[in-house]
Amino acid sequence: MEEEVPGFYGESGKSVQATLSSLKMLDVGKWPIFSLCSEEELQLIRQACVFGTAGNEVLYTTVNDEIFVLGTNCSGCLGVGDIQSTIEPRRLDSLTGKKIASLSYGSGPHIVLATTDGEVFTWGHNAYSQLGNGTTNHGLVPCHISTNLSNKQVIEVACGSYHSLVLTSDGEVFAWGYNNSGQVGSGSTANQPIPRRVTGCLQNKVVMSIACGQMCSMAVVDTGEVYVWGYNGNGQLGLGSSGNQPTPCRVAALQGIRVQRVACGYAHTLVLTDEGQIYAWGANSYGQLGTGNKSNQSYPTPVVVEKDRIIEIAACHSAHTSAAKSQGGHVYMWGQCRGQSVILPHLTHFCCTDDVFACFATPAVTWRLLSVEPDDHLTVAESLKREFDNPDTADLKFLVDGKYIYAHKVLLKIRCEHFRSSLEDSEDDIVEMSEFSYPVFRAFLEYLYTDNISLPPEEAVGLLDLATFYSETRLKKLCQQTIKQGICEENAIALLSAAVKYDAQDLEEFCFRFCINHLTVVTQTSGFAEMDHDLLKNFISKASRVGAFKN
């Protein structure tokens, strides 16, 4: 069983990030506290965060950039200037007009919020200086934190139980608050009343993301390494021991593995690699590591999730629950799920990881800042999306591989320069297409209606070819983003070749870096053996310049 510090179990801190993906699948109604809001109010919500020892506090923003709060207001965590509870939404006037980029909260609870302008505001519980304002007085209203941050652009925040971290745009981490286990990373165990840069092993590193456990801190740097510090009683630092770390220490067991993201549960840790693999370590009394048993692990241990590539991991400091989403859209959960111990990843019927925490975590809270959109009416974009491939309203159909795709001439001419000229004087209502496959051309037309692409990474190369052929710059960028999600050692050279062929410079650099980071395996693949001579020559030359062949 993991060690629990009295008073720490309740609302432990967790990092929450705004997300623009899967907006239609998010439903704030799954959190009971939103039953206090009217339907009209729910339709205006743009972002939402549910927290508190019983999921009894909420902060949300509206389409008008107003911030509202409701709940028990423990320690003044609603920021409205008093400690009165409220079952009706109250507007947080001091932050009206501010757009939230990142938000996190702690056990008191205390709130740390970063705006899209890079400013930091804090309020709520402050017995351990976790607000960073130099005092230990609770903050009843949002306070702008500028000490040592005045010239910094903060892009991400994270809270432990009673300590806080922020990440700046230049890759620096600042920390403050409770430090009994070294979680502030200052090298001592004295509390830190104001923001202090975390240095040591991070001094010359560029940090890409941060996370906090109950009393520990973590950072992922641009090289894919993970640095950890603070409390380690359950092995949650992944160092093979249970001793606390007062300064950042690299997780050596992940040598050669590039981590993209880290997430912290109550006393366990998850990381996601660039190949879509999950590793877990720390407390495991509820099966939250997903290893098939309940034994704690002090070293990173692989989590097997079918044969699906994972693109998202989720954990929440107030629960012993873990979740993940695959490239194919499957959502898995494990750990403590409504009182049951699920010791292996379990495939759910959910569309997003947020639903796992709404329906199975205790308490029912959000693990990140949700983004939602009103659905009281169809927007222009939604209306256009509905009309794609609709034979009832179309005035044009494409014949591709023996199958029809229905479209509308006026929209195609508005959205695509190629169609603007090719359809200008055409009276044909059927166009045969042989240059591209049915899935690729259908995905292209769907993109013109929705501004999104829905192709798996392995087929997106064909769409990249089309985007290059039609000079569709934005589509080309989206294709590159999709292709990146499917890279592995076996196809890295093929994707690099495609990137060079279609002058996709961002993808080319990404594939090259991936090949360098996995050089030993990549050079043994059939793709490398069959590599074009000129491409091979350029690859070796460039690899040499970045020191890939140094002893």
From Swiss-Prot:
Cellular component GO terms, alphabetically?
acrosomal vesicle; cytoplasm
Query: What is the top-level taxon of the source organism?
Result: Eukaryota
Q: Quote any Pfam family the record assigns.
A: BTB
Look up the signal peptide feature and give its range: none
SUPFAM superfamilies assigned: POZ domain, RCC1/BLIP-II
Each RCC1 repeat occupies one of these ranges, namely 64-115, 117-169, 171-222, 223-274, 276-326, 328-382
Q: Name one GO biological process term.
A: cell population proliferation
Q: Which residues form the BTB domain?
A: 394-457
Location comes to: Cytoplasmic vesicle, Secretory vesicle, Acrosome
Keywords of the record, alphabetical order, are: Cytoplasmic vesicle, Repeat
Q: Which PANTHER family match?
A: BTK-BINDING PROTEIN-RELATED (PTHR22872), RCC1 AND BTB DOMAIN CONTAINING PROTEIN 2 (PTHR22872:SF3)
Q: What is known of its domains?
A: The BTB domain might play a role in targeting to acrosomal vesicles.
Q: From the Swiss-Prot or TrEMBL record, give the protein name.
A: RCC1 and BTB domain-containing protein 2
Which species is listed as the source? Rattus norvegicus (Rat)
